[in-house]
Amino acid sequence: MDTKYKDDLFRKYVQFHEGKVDTTPGKQSGSDEYLRVAAATLLSLHKVDPLYRFRLIQFYEVVESSLRSLSSSSLSALHCAFSMLETMAINLFLFPWKKEFRSIKTYTGPFVYYVKSTLLEKDIRAILKFMGYEPELGTAYKLKELVESLQVKMVSFELFLAKVECEQMLGIHSQVKDKGYSELDVVTERKSSTEDARGCSDALRRRAESREHLTTSMARVALQKSASERAAKDYYKPRVTKPSRSVDAYDSYWESRKPPSKASLSLRKEPLAMDVGEDLKDEIIRPSPSLLTMSSSPHGSPDDLPSISPINGLGLLRSTYFPTQDDVDLYTDSEPRATYRRQDALRSDIWLVKNDAHSIYHKRSPPTKESALSKCQNCGLSCSSSLCQRCDSVCPSASKPSGFPSKASAHDSLVHGAPMREKYVGQTQGLDRLATVHSKPKPSTTATSRCGFCNRAGATNTCTQCSKVSCDPCLGAYHYDPCCRKSELHKFMPNNQLNYKSTQFSHPVYR
């Protein structure tokens, strides 16, 4: 710093304040604005070490410690504090003989609110000691006997420069506060910079811009790194963790393209035959719409059903059925005879199949108003006549006293289920079995009991559980009929093996 320029400003400062005391007209000084401009120019000299800006007071250290330690301290508050201390110094070197300036009360309002709330106690004591004040009893500062007027003037001039420096730092802060800088940052920059106020503000702006650019670059690098890591994880992770929907659709498509299994019921164009010799199971079959159109009544028309083919050279009973263009598979759930339930026979859309030599198919269509109250006298099922087709074919003598042989059902050519796809033994065994069934001797008309199934005389068997009587033909035909009491099958025994004699029923017995 130019020492000559500073000494010249110090001399003008002293003359300005001494001129206030001179009462001679025309010699009183006006405003100190030119002094402020000169002081700002002095503090903004280029390439000047900050340590040479202040000689007595360590200005930047005092301001920095105050801003760090006191929450009520700020650059504007420090400006007021330095201005008040400057006034004390001016009064002391202008009026040293006045007693009111020989002591300073620390508990007064202006001192408490403007000085003690802004500066630290040690800094206040150091500044007042330069002016010649010593602390007394902790509540006041008392002036020493000998007062060096030159030193007091120099302290006053330093306080004046401190006030101007606070104004400059306030101006710098107003320019860079939008960049996130605080007053303490401005003080730190001003303390270490050899530039003027404009140079300090430009340096702070450049630093803020470089920091923002660095932050943006680091964020961009972090994003690129995270993206590359994610790409690496996606590359090395297993490709398939679970089957996708497309795979499921592909599998389901080929599942649907598989040929039907042997256990599924299908109306194909290969010849089908029935084995008469094997003990097959009864099946419950739900017909397709194409089959429902073939018969509109429980008995059906023989012309609507496929005919029985002649016996081939191997002695097999062959039956061929060519389905319609739909070729719809009939999926059934066959049940053994032991688990047959009577309520299944009462359903309106059920086909009952007895796999015997002459297979009998009985279909119950939904009852109409005319046939709703008509039931079979033998089995109790709803039908259009007094006897259903099954009971009519099993017991022809009871339903047709005229003696005409019962006509075979036209449904004999229908075969269902996987068991019916197997090849059968010769027809001769079936014919022998039929001859055996129909050649049984008729019961004597002198019997005292009537059959509980066909209501014919000659019941020679009795159930040991429900006491129901049955003839020999019905015993073979209805041996799977469930017992009414214990939901089990009937246990028929010949009457001659019972220890009691069955009584004669005077009325027809229904199922």
Swiss-Prot record:
<dbReference type="GO" id="GO:0070266">
    <property type="term" value="P:necroptotic process"/>
</dbReference>
<dbReference type="GO" id="GO:0005737">
    <property type="term" value="C:cytoplasm"/>
</dbReference>
<keyword id="KW-1210">Necrosis</keyword>
<dbReference type="GO" id="GO:0007283">
    <property type="term" value="P:spermatogenesis"/>
</dbReference>
<comment type="similarity">
    <text>Belongs to the SPATA2 family.</text>
</comment>
<dbReference type="GO" id="GO:0030159">
    <property type="term" value="F:signaling receptor complex adaptor activity"/>
</dbReference>
<comment type="subunit">
    <text>Interacts (via the PIM motif) with RNF31/HOIP (via the PUB domain); the interaction is direct. Interacts (via the PUB domain) with CYLD; the interaction is direct.</text>
</comment>
<dbReference type="InterPro" id="IPR048839">
    <property type="entry name" value="SPATA2_PUB-like"/>
</dbReference>
<dbReference type="Pfam" id="PF21388">
    <property type="entry name" value="SPATA2_PUB-like"/>
</dbReference>
<dbReference type="GO" id="GO:1990381">
    <property type="term" value="F:ubiquitin-specific protease binding"/>
</dbReference>
<keyword id="KW-0963">Cytoplasm</keyword>
<dbReference type="GO" id="GO:0072520">
    <property type="term" value="P:seminiferous tubule development"/>
</dbReference>
<dbReference type="GO" id="GO:0010803">
    <property type="term" value="P:regulation of tumor necrosis factor-mediated signaling pathway"/>
</dbReference>
<keyword id="KW-0539">Nucleus</keyword>
<dbReference type="GO" id="GO:1990108">
    <property type="term" value="P:protein linear deubiquitination"/>
</dbReference>
<dbReference type="GO" id="GO:0001650">
    <property type="term" value="C:fibrillar center"/>
</dbReference>
<protein>
    <recommendedName>
        <fullName>Spermatogenesis-associated protein 2</fullName>
    </recommendedName>
</protein>
<comment type="function">
    <text>Bridging factor that mediates the recruitment of CYLD to the LUBAC complex, thereby regulating TNF-alpha-induced necroptosis. Acts as a direct binding intermediate that bridges RNF31/HOIP, the catalytic subunit of the LUBAC complex, and the deubiquitinase (CYLD), thereby recruiting CYLD to the TNF-R1 signaling complex (TNF-RSC). Required to activate the 'Met-1'- (linear) and 'Lys-63'-linked deubiquitinase activities of CYLD. Controls the kinase activity of RIPK1 and TNF-alpha-induced necroptosis by promoting 'Met-1'-linked deubiquitination of RIPK1 by CYLD.</text>
</comment>
<dbReference type="GO" id="GO:0044877">
    <property type="term" value="F:protein-containing complex binding"/>
</dbReference>
<feature type="short sequence motif" description="PIM motif">
    <location>
        <begin position="320"/>
        <end position="337"/>
    </location>
</feature>
<dbReference type="GO" id="GO:0005654">
    <property type="term" value="C:nucleoplasm"/>
</dbReference>
<dbReference type="GO" id="GO:0070536">
    <property type="term" value="P:protein K63-linked deubiquitination"/>
</dbReference>
<dbReference type="GO" id="GO:0060544">
    <property type="term" value="P:regulation of necroptotic process"/>
</dbReference>
<feature type="domain" description="PUB">
    <location>
        <begin position="77"/>
        <end position="149"/>
    </location>
</feature>
<dbReference type="GO" id="GO:0050727">
    <property type="term" value="P:regulation of inflammatory response"/>
</dbReference>
